[in-house]
Amino acid sequence: MKNTSSSTTLTMNDTIAAIATPLGKGAISIIKISGHNALNILKQLTQKQDFTPRYAYVCDIFSDGVLLDKALVIYFKAPYSFTGEDVCEIQCHGSPLLAQNILQACLNLGARLAKAGEFSKKAFLNHKMDLSEIEASVQLILCEDESVLNALARQLKGELKIFIEEARNNLLKLLASSEVLIDYSEEDIPSDFLKEVSFNLEKQIASFKDLLDFSNAQKQRNKGHALSIVGKPNAGKSSLLNAMLLEERALVSDIKGTTRDTIEEVIELKGHKVRLIDTAGIRESADEIERLGIEKSLKSLENCDIILGVFDLSKPLEKEDFNLMDTLNRTKKPCIVVLNKNDLAPKLELEILKSYLKIPYSILETNTLNSKACLKDLSQKISEFFPKLDTQNKLLLTSLAQTTALENAITELQNAKSHLDTLELFSYHILSAIENLNLLTRPYETSQMLDSMFSEFCLGK
C-alpha cells in the first residue's frame, strides 16, 4: 500500500522553481525558488557567495559559465518568507525566452518545476497562511469587480480568520459549559443557563447569515447582471447595443430579420459587470432560422436580470409592439422602456403603452445614433436597477467550499438550539458546527482545544 504521508513529506522537502509573472514580453520577469536548496542554487547562478536576507542585489546570472542576464535578486531566509522556507527571487529582463533559460538553469541545479499553486501550498502547510487567506489571494488575482477588492484585501490580511476563530471560541465555551453539566448531572442546571445559551446561539447564527447573504449577493454580482435587449424588428436593438459598446458590434440594416441569433458582450457600468444580450427581433416569421433566433430571444428573457424593451417612437404602436408588451408582462422582470429615434416626430401612443405594461419599468427617450449621449442616459437608468451593496467593513466567502461549510455550521447551530433540553444532542450539534468552521480556516483536533478550554472552568460555571 502506498504511504501517502511519506510521499507528501518527500514532495514538500523538494526545492521548487517557477516563473511567477505572466507569459509574454514585459519590463521584468520573476523566477521564484523555494526550498532548502534555494540559496545554494542562487549562489551557483550568480557566482556570488554572500547574501544578506531581504537585501536586493544586482547580479550577473550564469548558466554553465555562460552569461544570461544582469538581474535583481533577493534572498528571504526561512521562516521569514512567503512559503516559510528559504526563498530566492530573480527579477530578470522581461523576455519569455530569457526567463525560460534562467528557469531551466535552476532545474539543472537541482530544483523541481513547481506545480500549480505549490508555493501557496507550502505556505499553508508551513502555517504562513490559512485556507481563507489562500482563497482570498486566488480571488484577488481573478477579481474584476472594484467593490470586492477591499473585502478580499482584508480577508488576505486575516480578518475572516479572526472572525471565524472568535466564533469558534464562543462555541467552544458553550460546548465546555454543556459538557460540565452533563458530567455533573447531579448539579442543578442554572435557571438562566438555557436563556443565555439561546441568546448567544441566535446572535451567532445571525452573524453567520449576514456573512452568507452578503457573499451570495456578491457572487451574483460577480457573474454580471444579464441585460436582454428586445424589441420588434428594426426598432433599433442592434443600434442600441452598438451605442453601449461604442463600436459596430451588431449588423444594422433596414431589412427585417437581420439579427437572427443572440449576440452577447460584457461591459462595465458604474463599477458593475453587465452582460448585454442583443436578441433577434420578436415577430411571427416563416423563416426557420429566424424563428429559432426568436425562440432564443424569448429564452434569454427567462434568464436575464433586466430587460431593455426597445420601441420605435416615430411609429404608432403595432401588433408586434403589443405582442412584445405581452411577453414583457409575462416575464415579470424589471424593464427599461427605451423609446428610440426621438430625433423624429413622435407617433407612438405613450399613454397606451404605459397602461398596457404591468411590470416595474422606467422610460428613456433616446437616439441610438448619438452613441455617447445614449450611453450616458442608459448607464444612469440601468444603474438604478442594480442592488445596493454596502461593501465597507464586510467579510466575504470566496468559494463554494467556504459557503457550504458555513451553511452546514448554521444548520448545526439551529439543531443545537432546538435540543437545548437534551445536553448530549446539544453538544453533538455544537461540535459539528465547530468542525464545519474548521474547514473555513485550518482543520485541527477539537479535543485539544477543549482540554485547554475546560481547564479554565470551575464546577458550576
From Swiss-Prot:
Q: Which InterPro entries match?
A: G_TrmE, GTP-bd, GTP-bd_TrmE_N, GTPase_MnmE, MnmE_dom2, MnmE_helical, P-loop_NTPase, Small_GTP-bd
Q: Which residues of the sequence carry a binding annotation for (6S)-5-formyl-5,6,7,8-tetrahydrofolate?
A: K32, E89, K128, K461
Statement: the UniProt record of this protein carries the keyword Magnesium: yes
Residue span, TrmE-type G domain:
224-387
Binding of GTP: at which residues?
Answer: 234-239, 253-259, 278-281
* Record key words, sorted: Cytoplasm, GTP-binding, Hydrolase, Magnesium, Metal-binding, Nucleotide-binding, Potassium, tRNA processing
Instruction: Name its co-factor(s).
Output: K(+)
Per UniProt, K(+) binds at N234, S253, I255, T258
**Places the protein is found:** Cytoplasm
A Gene Ontology biological process noted in the UniProt record is: tRNA methylation
Which cysteine pairs are covalently linked by disulfides here? none
Gene3D superfamilies listed in its UniProt record: P-loop containing nucleotide triphosphate hydrolases (3.40.50.300), Probable tRNA modification gtpase trme, domain 1 (3.30.1360.120), tRNA modification GTPase MnmE domain 2 (1.20.120.430)
Q: Where does Mg(2+) bind?
A: S238, T259
Q: Which PROSITE patterns match?
A: G_TRME (PS51709)
Tell me which CDD domains the record gives. Answer: trmE, TrmE_N
Q: Name one GO molecular function term.
A: GTP binding
User: EC number(s) for this protein?
Assistant: 3.6.-.-
GO cellular component annotations, sorted alphabetically?
A: cytosol
Per UniProt, the cofactor note for this protein states: Binds 1 potassium ion per subunit.
What protein family is recorded?
Belongs to the TRAFAC class TrmE-Era-EngA-EngB-Septin-like GTPase superfamily. TrmE GTPase family.
Subunit note: Homodimer. Heterotetramer of two MnmE and two MnmG subunits.
Q: What is the annotated role of this protein in its UniProt record?
A: Exhibits a very high intrinsic GTPase hydrolysis rate. Involved in the addition of a carboxymethylaminomethyl (cmnm) group at the wobble position (U34) of certain tRNAs, forming tRNA-cmnm(5)s(2)U34.
Protein name, per record: tRNA modification GTPase MnmE
What is the species listed in this Swiss-Prot or TrEMBL entry?
Answer: Helicobacter pylori (strain J99 / ATCC 700824) (Campylobacter pylori J99)
What gene is it encoded by? Answer: mnmE
